[in-house]
Amino acid sequence: MSPQIDAVILAGGMARRMGGNDKGLVELNDQPMIKHAIDRIKPQVKQILINANRNQNRYAEFGYPVLSDEDSGYLGPLAGMITAMGQTQADYLLVVPCDCPLLPTDLVQRMLAAITAEDAEMAVASDGKREQPVVLLMKPALRGSMKAFLDAGERKIDFWYAKHHCVVCDFSDQPNAFVNVNTPEQKQQLSEAIAH
Protein backbone atom coordinates (compact mmCIF):
# COMPACT_ATOMS: atom_id res chain seq x y z
CA MET A 1 0.00 0.00 0.00
CA SER A 2 1.46 3.35 -0.98
CA PRO A 3 2.02 5.86 1.82
CA GLN A 4 -0.31 8.79 2.33
CA ILE A 5 1.34 12.12 1.60
CA ASP A 6 0.06 15.59 2.49
CA ALA A 7 1.68 18.89 1.55
CA VAL A 8 2.09 22.24 3.20
CA ILE A 9 2.74 25.31 1.10
CA LEU A 10 4.67 27.86 3.14
CA ALA A 11 3.28 31.37 2.73
CA GLY A 12 3.92 32.61 6.24
CA GLY A 13 6.91 34.91 5.73
CA MET A 14 7.20 38.67 5.80
CA ALA A 15 8.54 39.02 2.23
CA ARG A 16 10.81 41.95 3.06
CA ARG A 17 12.57 41.77 -0.34
CA MET A 18 9.19 42.00 -2.10
CA GLY A 19 8.46 45.30 -0.39
CA GLY A 20 6.40 43.52 2.26
CA ASN A 21 3.88 42.25 -0.30
CA ASP A 22 2.47 38.83 0.56
CA LYS A 23 4.47 36.70 -1.89
CA GLY A 24 1.90 33.95 -2.27
CA LEU A 25 -0.68 36.49 -3.43
CA VAL A 26 1.58 38.41 -5.81
CA GLU A 27 0.34 37.86 -9.36
CA LEU A 28 2.56 36.03 -11.80
CA ASN A 29 1.13 35.78 -15.32
CA ASP A 30 -2.41 36.54 -14.10
CA GLN A 31 -2.38 34.03 -11.24
CA PRO A 32 -1.37 34.41 -7.60
CA MET A 33 2.04 32.85 -7.05
CA ILE A 34 0.64 30.22 -4.69
CA LYS A 35 -1.82 29.03 -7.36
CA HIS A 36 1.11 27.96 -9.53
CA ALA A 37 2.47 25.90 -6.61
CA ILE A 38 -0.97 24.41 -5.88
CA ASP A 39 -1.42 23.36 -9.51
CA ARG A 40 1.98 21.62 -9.51
CA ILE A 41 1.52 19.85 -6.16
CA LYS A 42 -2.18 18.94 -6.13
CA PRO A 43 -1.92 15.79 -8.33
CA GLN A 44 0.94 14.48 -6.18
CA VAL A 45 -0.59 14.54 -2.68
CA LYS A 46 -3.76 13.65 -0.79
CA GLN A 47 -4.29 16.97 0.97
CA ILE A 48 -2.81 20.45 0.75
CA LEU A 49 -2.40 22.73 3.76
CA ILE A 50 -1.46 26.40 3.47
CA ASN A 51 0.67 28.05 6.16
CA ALA A 52 -0.07 31.79 6.26
CA ASN A 53 0.26 34.40 9.00
CA ARG A 54 -1.66 37.19 7.28
CA ASN A 55 -4.37 37.47 4.63
CA GLN A 56 -5.74 34.13 5.83
CA ASN A 57 -9.16 34.84 4.30
CA ARG A 58 -7.58 35.38 0.89
CA TYR A 59 -5.67 32.12 1.16
CA ALA A 60 -8.82 30.28 2.30
CA GLU A 61 -10.39 31.17 -1.07
CA PHE A 62 -8.17 28.52 -2.68
CA GLY A 63 -10.23 25.88 -0.85
CA TYR A 64 -7.60 24.38 1.45
CA PRO A 65 -7.11 24.57 5.22
CA VAL A 66 -5.10 27.64 6.24
CA LEU A 67 -2.85 27.27 9.29
CA SER A 68 -1.14 30.10 11.14
CA ASP A 69 2.08 29.48 13.07
CA GLU A 70 1.48 28.12 16.57
CA ASP A 71 4.18 30.50 17.79
CA SER A 72 3.51 34.10 16.80
CA GLY A 73 6.37 36.36 15.85
CA TYR A 74 7.36 35.24 12.33
CA LEU A 75 9.89 32.64 13.44
CA GLY A 76 10.52 31.49 9.88
CA PRO A 77 9.74 28.37 7.84
CA LEU A 78 10.39 25.96 10.72
CA ALA A 79 7.41 27.39 12.61
CA GLY A 80 5.12 26.75 9.65
CA MET A 81 6.42 23.21 9.24
CA ILE A 82 5.89 22.45 12.94
CA THR A 83 2.31 23.69 12.74
CA ALA A 84 1.56 21.57 9.66
CA MET A 85 3.22 18.47 11.14
CA GLY A 86 0.83 18.75 14.07
CA GLN A 87 -2.19 18.86 11.76
CA THR A 88 -1.50 15.97 9.38
CA GLN A 89 -2.24 12.29 9.84
CA ALA A 90 -0.24 11.38 6.72
CA ASP A 91 2.81 9.13 6.57
CA TYR A 92 4.83 11.93 4.98
CA LEU A 93 4.56 15.69 4.71
CA LEU A 94 5.82 17.49 1.63
CA VAL A 95 7.00 21.05 2.28
CA VAL A 96 7.25 23.59 -0.54
CA PRO A 97 7.45 27.39 -0.65
CA CYS A 98 4.67 29.51 -2.17
CA ASP A 99 7.05 31.28 -4.56
CA CYS A 100 8.31 28.36 -6.68
CA PRO A 101 5.93 28.26 -9.65
CA LEU A 102 7.91 25.63 -11.61
CA LEU A 103 8.04 22.83 -9.03
CA PRO A 104 8.63 19.38 -10.57
CA THR A 105 5.51 17.39 -11.41
CA ASP A 106 7.39 14.27 -10.24
CA LEU A 107 8.65 15.84 -7.00
CA VAL A 108 6.92 13.44 -4.59
CA GLN A 109 7.61 10.33 -6.65
CA ARG A 110 11.34 10.98 -6.81
CA MET A 111 11.74 12.15 -3.22
CA LEU A 112 9.82 9.15 -1.89
CA ALA A 113 11.95 6.81 -4.01
CA ALA A 114 15.11 8.43 -2.59
CA ILE A 115 13.84 8.00 0.99
CA THR A 116 12.90 4.37 0.36
CA ALA A 117 16.21 3.52 -1.31
CA GLU A 118 18.21 4.91 1.63
CA ASP A 119 15.72 4.05 4.39
CA ALA A 120 15.99 7.74 5.31
CA GLU A 121 13.79 9.91 7.53
CA MET A 122 13.48 12.66 4.96
CA ALA A 123 14.61 13.95 1.59
CA VAL A 124 15.67 17.44 0.55
CA ALA A 125 15.58 18.55 -3.08
CA SER A 126 18.65 19.82 -4.91
CA ASP A 127 18.85 21.63 -8.23
CA GLY A 128 22.25 20.02 -8.80
CA LYS A 129 24.14 23.05 -7.46
CA ARG A 130 22.62 23.52 -4.04
CA GLU A 131 20.09 22.02 -1.70
CA GLN A 132 16.66 23.62 -1.40
CA PRO A 133 16.04 23.58 2.38
CA VAL A 134 12.33 24.44 2.12
CA VAL A 135 11.60 21.63 -0.34
CA LEU A 136 11.43 18.61 1.96
CA LEU A 137 9.59 15.32 2.21
CA MET A 138 9.62 14.08 5.80
CA LYS A 139 7.87 12.03 8.43
CA PRO A 140 5.59 14.14 10.66
CA ALA A 141 6.92 12.18 13.65
CA LEU A 142 10.00 14.45 13.42
CA ARG A 143 7.91 17.33 14.78
CA GLY A 144 9.27 16.98 18.33
CA SER A 145 12.84 17.21 17.13
CA MET A 146 12.09 20.25 14.98
CA LYS A 147 10.20 22.00 17.78
CA ALA A 148 13.07 21.43 20.24
CA PHE A 149 15.47 22.87 17.64
CA LEU A 150 13.31 25.98 17.16
CA ASP A 151 12.72 26.37 20.91
CA ALA A 152 16.52 26.37 21.38
CA GLY A 153 16.66 29.52 19.24
CA GLU A 154 17.81 27.83 16.05
CA ARG A 155 16.34 28.87 12.69
CA LYS A 156 18.41 27.29 9.91
CA ILE A 157 16.55 24.34 8.43
CA ASP A 158 19.66 22.74 6.93
CA PHE A 159 21.29 22.63 10.38
CA TRP A 160 18.23 20.75 11.63
CA TYR A 161 18.01 18.16 8.88
CA ALA A 162 21.76 17.55 9.08
CA LYS A 163 21.03 15.99 12.49
CA HIS A 164 18.83 13.35 10.85
CA HIS A 165 19.12 10.69 8.16
CA CYS A 166 18.33 12.98 5.24
CA VAL A 167 18.91 12.02 1.62
CA VAL A 168 19.53 14.62 -1.10
CA CYS A 169 17.27 14.16 -4.11
CA ASP A 170 18.88 15.42 -7.31
CA PHE A 171 16.74 17.39 -9.75
CA SER A 172 19.62 18.71 -11.87
CA ASP A 173 17.66 17.55 -14.93
CA GLN A 174 15.16 20.32 -14.06
CA PRO A 175 17.49 23.19 -13.10
CA ASN A 176 14.73 25.84 -13.13
CA ALA A 177 12.29 23.85 -11.01
CA PHE A 178 13.18 25.67 -7.80
CA VAL A 179 13.61 29.18 -9.16
CA ASN A 180 11.82 31.36 -6.66
CA VAL A 181 10.70 34.95 -6.51
CA ASN A 182 12.17 37.17 -3.82
CA THR A 183 12.36 40.51 -5.63
CA PRO A 184 10.24 42.34 -8.22
CA GLU A 185 13.13 41.89 -10.68
CA GLN A 186 13.08 38.11 -10.26
CA LYS A 187 9.32 38.16 -10.73
CA GLN A 188 9.70 39.93 -14.06
CA GLN A 189 12.38 37.48 -15.25
CA LEU A 190 10.28 34.47 -14.27
CA SER A 191 7.16 35.91 -15.86
CA GLU A 192 9.02 36.28 -19.14
CA ALA A 193 10.43 32.73 -18.88
CA ILE A 194 6.97 31.22 -18.27
CA ALA A 195 5.46 33.19 -21.14
CA HIS A 196 7.92 31.71 -23.66
Curated annotation (Swiss-Prot):
Leading EC class: transferase
Keywords, sorted A to Z: Cytoplasm, GTP-binding, Magnesium, Metal-binding, Molybdenum cofactor biosynthesis, Nucleotide-binding, Transferase
Main subcellular location: cytoplasm
Residues where Mg(2+) binds: 99
Molecular function GO terms recorded: GTP binding; metal ion binding; molybdenum cofactor guanylyltransferase activity
Function: Transfers a GMP moiety from GTP to Mo-molybdopterin (Mo-MPT) cofactor (Moco or molybdenum cofactor) to form Mo-molybdopterin guanine dinucleotide (Mo-MGD) cofactor.
One GO location term (cellular component): cytoplasm
Protein name listed in UniProt: Molybdenum cofactor guanylyltransferase
Localization (cell): Cytoplasm
CDD domains associated with the record: MobA (cd02503)
Subunit description: Monomer.
PANTHER family in the cross-refs: MOLYBDENUM COFACTOR GUANYLYLTRANSFERASE
Gene3D superfamilies found in the cross-reference section: Spore Coat Polysaccharide Biosynthesis Protein SpsA, Chain A (3.90.550.10)
Gene for this chain: mobA
Lineage: Bacteria, Pseudomonadati, Pseudomonadota, Gammaproteobacteria, Alteromonadales
Protein biosynthesis as UniProt keyword: no
InterPro entries: MobA-like_NTP_Trfase (IPR025877), Molybde_CF_guanTrfase (IPR013482), Nucleotide-diphossugar_trans (IPR029044)
Entry's EC annotation: 2.7.7.77
Pfam family, one: NTP_transf_3
Residues binding GTP, per UniProt: 10-12, 23, 51, 69, 99
Domain notes: The N-terminal domain determines nucleotide recognition and specific binding, while the C-terminal domain determines the specific binding to the target protein.
Gene Ontology terms describing biological process: bis(molybdopterin guanine dinucleotide)molybdenum biosynthetic process
Reactions catalysed, as given in the entry: Mo-molybdopterin + GTP + H(+) = Mo-molybdopterin guanine dinucleotide + diphosphate
Family: Belongs to the MobA family.
Cofactor: Mg(2+)
